[in-house]
Structure formats: C-alpha cells, structure tokens
C-alpha cells in the first residue's frame, strides 16, 4: 500500500463530507428546476467553475505580480497578469486591479484611495435604485462620509440630470457615484462627467449590474468618462463572484493598488482571479455580444408583456437587464409577490421602488433580471411566457388550479432550456 492511499486530501467530496455534497446537489437541482430572475445572478460556465475549484486555492500571493511577499508565485503571476490584460482589453482601460474580493471591496478601496472621513459624496438613494455602498446610512460609506443623496424624477422615474447638477453645485461633493443596482435605464456618463468637472469632484462609476452589457457594447461605457470604474465580475459579466477596479490615469492606479493591498485586503484569491480571467476571455468572444444583445431584448419583452397584463413597470420599461415592477398598481406588496412567485419556482427579490411608502422589508416592488435565463437559452418569446406565468400567479393568489398550471409551465420551460449539458441526465456536478 502506498503512503498516499487513504489520505484525507485524496477523498472526493461525496466521500469526505456527504452532508455538504448533498446540499450542493440539492442547490444544483434547485437551479435546474427554478426560473432564476434575480437581477444580480447568472450561471457561470463550467470552465469558470473549474478554474475556481482548482489547486490555485492553495496558493498565497500577497502583493502584485512580480512584487510578491511569498515565493512560488511564478504561475499565479502569469494568471493574474493575463486576467489584468484581458480586463483592460475588454473594457478599454489603461489599468486594472483584479484582486478585490467583491464589488463592495472595490468601492471601499476607491474611497480609501480618494477620500478622507467626513468628505462629502453624492450617490443615488437606495430606495431609488442605488446601492448600500453608495452612502447608505447602514453601510460604512454612510458612516464615514457626509452623504448627499440624489433621486429620480417622481413623474418619469428617471434620473434628472439638471436636478443632480443643482444638488452638486449646492453641496460641492468630493466624489460623485453613478451606476446602480435597480435602475433600468441607460446612464448618461458624459453628463455626470460634466457635472463632476463643474464642481471639481471625482467621478466613480459602479457598473456592477451592467458590466457585461458594457463589455459587449450594448450599453455606453463609463471608462472614457470616469476617474475610476468598479464592478463585480458575476451578474451580466457571467464570471465568478468577485470585484474589479479600472481606470485611465497612472497616478490614480498607484493609489488604487495600495488601497487594495495593503490598504483593505491581504492575500488575493488566486483561484477566483483565474476564474475571472476565464470569464474575461469568454466575454471577449463574438458570441458574448450576441448573448448581451439577447439579454436586453429579453428584458424588453418581459417588461412589455407584464405591462400588457396590467402591471406597472418602473420608468415604463427598461434599457438594460433589469425589470422593476411597481406593485402598487395591483394593490400588492413586494414581500407578498416574492412569496407568490417563489411558490411556483420563480426566483426574484422584493425591492423598493422610487418614493416607496413601504419599508425595505416589505416594499412595493419586485425586481427581475434576464441575464441568467438568457444564459440558459431563453429567447424573447420564452420571456413573454414567463411574464404570463408571473401575471397569472400574482392575479390569482388563491387559485390552486392556476398555481399548478404555473408550476407545470415553469417545469416545461426548465426542461426546454436545461442549465448545463448534463442537466437532463441528472448528473451531479461538483466540478
């Protein structure tokens, strides 16, 4: 018998920890048999998952490529350098840092590099579609800085750039944040640049939700207009869960590098960075542009059909992957609607809408996104059918027969558009 036989590190997960293996396979089954409409979620490729589940998880590599504090980094250096080059090529940036563990970490590093506690920042109100890290009082960004929040116009539910300009002129922020978590319309980055220049502010674009659309050229890019751009690497970009910082200025780049390490993080996650590199490579392919165009077309189809069925959509439609329902039009809360669609295997999230009278735990909205199901192959016609299932369920919450029909239609759609190639064979995938 060899010395290697029977070692704990050689056991498969199913042998080593059957409980965790079972939970993973249950989650795999849930993803296969439910319609994923959470706007911040997507399905990573098998290649991305293989990179993330590799031996790279064993390697510590504090510092930057060729400037590490540990030995044995020659291979992770090559991987990280490739991830950086692909990110720069994908977004037309002069510099990239691929080490942030998340979008929130990327934003925090930018704040650390450019701001001092007590400085004034401007960001979109969370209830109007902003993000926690853009100055919400429950987040460190809202505790360390003087926050001025702008909102959308009450009638159009779109950004009013002149109102934002007047607010900036009044408060003279040191940094303005644009880019959002629940704003379904195109962002005018050039207009934000003009405002930032007028008041002498830095301009940060958080494109976490639209990064894939930007990469594919189906949404305007913030990179030419902003001092710094942050993003996650999942969502519409379809990579692993992680963060990324981009900029055009070499002096800023040095500050951001130091703000990531040693300023706010220790060792980078090289297995995740490898998965980011794979995802960036996928996004550089022509097929990714076609995918992103379909994401936007599918969102338009979903919004149009829901409106046709009598449900209001915030701003009257969408220009990106997000469709935000205003359920006040049907006398329902987001909390109730979320439970109703979840009960027929549609996964979404309750969400505040502009000028929402309900609390964030109840809300008047339901947020959908089309990136994940588009990855499964759903087209516009399939999304119209999804809209009908949603409407049937919301308008008939007590009808068991309609509930069952909704479940049947969801099941049929999942069979028609399997998640991974082996989904129909029910093979467990632990990568």
Swiss-Prot record:
Pfam families named in the record: SHMT
Record-annotated site: Plays an important role in substrate specificity: 234
Naturally occurring in which organism (per UniProt): Synechococcus sp. (strain CC9605)
Any single Gene Ontology cellular-component annotation: cytosol
Protein name stated in the entry: Serine hydroxymethyltransferase
Coarse class of the protein's main subcellular location: cytoplasm
E.C. designation(s): 2.1.2.1
Modified residues annotated as N6-(pyridoxal phosphate)lysine in this record: 235
Source species, domain of life: Bacteria
GO term, biological process aspect, one: glycine biosynthetic process from serine
Binding site for (6S)-5,6,7,8-tetrahydrofolate: 126, 130-132, 359-361
Reactions performed catalytically: (6R)-5,10-methylene-5,6,7,8-tetrahydrofolate + glycine + H2O = (6S)-5,6,7,8-tetrahydrofolate + L-serine
Subcellular location: Cytoplasm
Pathway membership: One-carbon metabolism; tetrahydrofolate interconversion; Amino-acid biosynthesis; glycine biosynthesis; glycine from L-serine: step 1/1
